[in-house]
Design a protein with these regions (language model features):
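Extended, compositionally biased non-globular segments
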Residues: 213, 227-325
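Extracellular/lumenal glycan-associated surfaces
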Residues: 129-132, 180-193, 301-315
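Bacterial signal peptide processing site
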Residues: 19-21
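Short, flexible domain-boundary/linker segments around small modular repeats
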Residues: 129-175, 261-294
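Solvent-exposed N-terminal domain segments of exported/luminal and surface proteins
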Residues: 23-168
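Extracellular structured ligand-interaction cores
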Residues: 99-101, 122-124, 171, 181-185, ...
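C-terminal motif of bacterial Sec signal peptides marking the signal peptidase cleavage site
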Residues: 14-17
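Sec-dependent signal peptide recognition
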Residues: 2-11
Length: 325
């Protein structure tokens, strides 16, 4: 991972004007039947940026437009910021262009207070502004005996990508790595995307969830409904369980898939926090609900909206969606 210096990105000017206008009026006549409207926010973006990072060396292309009641994303999934070294010993995949095409409602509606779980490659839970996918869970699993695989394991214990040192998925400074398909994706805080968007200390809209609600990174108002209150790092409402679940493996006995596979007797302790099941949701413990979101005012939505938050602590990013997909 290169942490000593930041390699500059060269910005290629398009013949089409690039825009990040949050007050575009082309959808001002849209009458939403849902709970909220996002019609005039970030619906006129068209960017092409050359990323000369040694692990990328490609154009990052992404566009956000609207049509009727839909927000439309097209892009190539190439990050528009510095990344770590890929391939690397714990993530042997190179970044490559993807064909990203997705639609999101401009009129999101909450249909489940508990949230609907979204895990796996069939549906992206969210996309960042630069068309890079948010995919917080992993395919890594362990069985009760401690036999684990980082690549589609068969056990019932779900391995977390972040927050521990037992399993290394080769993630970089953006808490991201690369799938075998070449798709670079975020598991947590996209640090250099936030820097690119220009607001490391502000309330930064970094993407959109598949149900149409916005995604913000790290910060929010101390009083959710008061834009004059202090900006604070928002806290999730999850904590480590005081006791491990029955039959939870405590020692890694074999690594049978993924980087490092074939290590038959590693005998490495598996601390609490390595598995998704090690955490529990406690309503009101932090600022956010079970889907790592809340209702409140934001710079883009001064009247208030439900929004998800990327956090520094588990679950890092929502694992469920409250709106209709």
């Amino acid at each position: 991972m290169r942490v000593g210096s930041i390699i500059p990105l060269f910005f290629i000017l398009l013949s089409i004007s690039c825009s990040k206008n949050t007050n575009n009026n082309k959808d001002s006549e849209l009458a939403c039947e849902g709970d909220f409207s996002t019609a005039n926010v970030l619906v006129d973006i068209d960017e092409e940026i050359f990323n000369n990072d040694l692990s990328v060396n490609a154009y990052s292309r992404y566009a956000w437009t609207s049509e009727g009641s839909d927000r439309i994303l097209t892009g190539n999934g190439i990050p528009n910021h510095q990344v770590g070294i890929f391939p690397n010993p714990n993530n042997p995949n190179a970044i490559s262009e993807q064909n990203v095409s997705a639609r999101f409602t401009l009129c999101p509606t909450i249909i489940s207070e508990a949230g609907l779980e979204v895990i796996g490659p069939a549906l992206a839970i969210a996309y960042a502004i630069n068309s890079v996918k948010f995919d917080p869970a992993t395919a890594g699993r362990c069985d009760d005996s401690g036999a684990c695989s980082l690549a589609r394991g068969q056990g019932r214990w779900n391995i977390e990508a972040l927050g521990h040192n037992t399993f290394d998925f080769g993630d970089d400074m953006n808490h991201a790595h690369v799938q075998p398909s070449g798709e670079y994706h975020y598991h947590g805080m996209p640090e250099l995307l936030i820097e690119f968007l220009g607001d490391n200390k502000g309330m930064t809209l970094v993407g959109w969830a598949s149900d149409g609600f916005p995604v913000y990174a790290r910060y929010g108002y101390a009083q959710a409904d008061d834009a004059t209150s202090e900006l604070v790092a928002l806290k999730p409402s999850y904590r480590l369980k005081t006791q491990a679940d029955p039959n939870r493996p405590s020692v890694l006995t074999a690594l049978i898939g993924g980087p490092g596979q074939g290590t038959t007797s590693p005998n490495i302790p598996i601390p609490m926090g390595a598995f998704t099941q090690d955490f529990e949701y406690i309503s009101g413990l932090g600022d956010l609900d079970q889907c790592n979101g809340r209702f409140g005012v934001t710079p883009e939505f001064p009247e208030g909206i439900y929004y998800y938050v990327v956090t520094d602590d588990f679950p890092f990013f929502t694992r469920c969606l409250k709106g209709e997909i």
